[in-house]
Structure formats: C-alpha cells, structure tokens
Amino acid sequence: METQRLRIAMQKSGRLSQDSQALFKSCGLKINLREQRLIAHVENMPIDILRVRDDDIPGLVMEGVVDLGIIGENVLEEAQLIRASQGLPAQVKTLKQLDFGGCRLSLAVPDDVAYTGPESLAGKRIATSYPGLLKRFFDEKGLNFKSVMLGGSVEVAPRAGLADAICDLVSTGATLEANGLKEVEVIYRSKAVLVQAPNPLNEAKQKLIDKLLPRIQGMQQARESKYIMLHAPKDKLDAITDLLPGAERPTIMQLAGDTNQVALHVVSSETLFWETMEQLKALGASSILVLPIEKMME
C-alpha cells in the first residue's frame, strides 16, 4: 500500500544541506534535522525528509523511491546523461529552480599553460567528476579528449601528473589558485532545483505539493523584493515611480497637514541601490525607508 506521507530527499551534508533546511523552515515545516537520522518526520504536515548523498538523489527520484528531491542541476543532469546511456530511467519533473546552490562547472589548466579555446585541450587528459557533462561539451565542439574519472580532489590531478587539465565545480576560484590552476572556460552553470518523480502521485500527495509550491515561490519573491516607503512631492510622483524597478501600483496616501506631499508605499522586485536612493532624494523624496520582506503571496 502506498504511503500517504510525502517523501522528500535532500543532501545530508554539504553546500545544499543548510539552504534546504532553511527553505523547509521558511515554508512553515516544523522539523528537527539536528540528529544524525536518515529520515526525519515533519511535525505539522505528512512529510518525511530523507537525508542522503547528493549523488543518490536523482536515482531515488527517477525510480520513484521518493516523491521530491532538492538537487543541484549539475548533479541532476550528469545523472540523466549517465543513466540514459545505461538504459535506466532518467526522467524527472522540474518544479522550481531555487535561489541557492549557484555554481559553475569549468575547465581549468595549470597557470603556465596557454589556453586559446577548447581546441587547446584536444587529445589531452582531463580529470573530472562529471564525465557526462564534459563529454557532451566536447562532443558539441567536435573534439576528442581523454577522460580521467576522479571521485574527489580533482584539482590535484595536474600536479600529480594524472591529467593535463581539469573540469570541476568552481565557486570562488580560491581552490584552483591554491593548486596552481586557472579557470579558462565555463561549460555549465547550475543552481539547486526542486524535482518530482515522473509518475503521477496520489491525490493527497499532489495536493500537498500544490500547497508547498506557492510557499516556496513566495519566499523567493520576498528575498528578491523590498518594501519601500517614502514621502514624495505630488508633482514628482511619475518621475519617482519610474525610478523604482519592478514597482507595480504603489499605495499613495495624503500626508496629514501637507497638501503638496504624499506618502508612497511600494514593493520593488529588484535591489534598490544607493544611487537610486540619491536620485529619489534629488527629485524631492524624503524619509526614504527600504525594508526586507519576510513572506509574500500573490
């Protein structure tokens, strides 16, 4: 008998783990993930959280072992390429790209090696943990190379004489620099995504997903938006609202005892920079407040 509890897989530890936990909390899920248990139960919703290795999440979702998974696009697409080549199920439904887990998969070569393009690495040994994505990139360029598969510490491969170049995830580039390497080309950009198993779920689970998605969307919109309050001269309202990026239908209220100014409240969907605030002030705006938004729902 199919369980009525929604099962969500997330990374047990690593760069996506804390962000996934924060996402669950912001969506109102009461859960204790401090203990080293592989399965945690949400207290206020029929949801179970499975804490697993990130490499295992795509297969668990594709096979229908779990209903949802939070995974990096790089790990997901690598798994899809490898599984498809092996004749295994490789389909998922991508429900939402999330606003965390950003990284890039890049080619890097030793500092003293000249790089003029992918053709510079034709026939060379390239160490990577992402052979599928790397092969696809070079296939699209019509170039051959020798793949050196490593499960970790890819950046030491050139210095150890195992490879001529590497293809690895890059965040700041500090690890590359520490190992005498330079980033020369980005072949894939990735963020975390929420994915669903390909087969239809029962009505109870689907209703729960339909309840969670607007919460996730609202949290992401809130993080990307600011609530702006200011006093503005009536004759400058059009110019002032034009300066507020993403603003829609501001709330305008008459100031007590002042017939020439109004109070303007608006949600702006983009960051308000100091330069914009200075322009607002130059137009006569005053008492400008920019506040974070905790939650939003359209």
Swiss-Prot record:
Pathway: Amino-acid biosynthesis; L-histidine biosynthesis; L-histidine from 5-phospho-alpha-D-ribose 1-diphosphate: step 1/9. Its main location: cytoplasm. It catalyses: 1-(5-phospho-beta-D-ribosyl)-ATP + diphosphate = 5-phospho-alpha-D-ribose 1-diphosphate + ATP. The keyword Ribonucleoprotein does not apply. Keywords: Amino-acid biosynthesis, ATP-binding, Cytoplasm, Glycosyltransferase, Histidine biosynthesis, Magnesium, Metal-binding, Nucleotide-binding, Transferase. Its EC number is 2.4.2.17. Pfam families: HisG, HisG_C. It comes from the Bacteria. Its cofactor is Mg(2+). SUPFAM superfamilies: GlnB-like (SSF54913), Periplasmic binding protein-like II (SSF53850). Feedback inhibited by histidine. It is found in: Cytoplasm. Coiled coil: none annotated. GO terms for cellular component: cytoplasm. One of its GO terms (biological process) is L-histidine biosynthetic process. The keyword Nucleotide-binding applies. GO terms for molecular function: ATP binding; ATP phosphoribosyltransferase activity; magnesium ion binding. Catalyzes the condensation of ATP and 5-phosphoribose 1-diphosphate to form N'-(5'-phosphoribosyl)-ATP (PR-ATP). Has a crucial role in the pathway because the rate of histidine biosynthesis seems to be controlled primarily by regulation of HisG enzymatic activity. Belongs to the ATP phosphoribosyltransferase family. Long subfamily. This is ATP phosphoribosyltransferase. The lineage of its organism: Bacteria, Pseudomonadati, Pseudomonadota, Gammaproteobacteria, Aeromonadales.
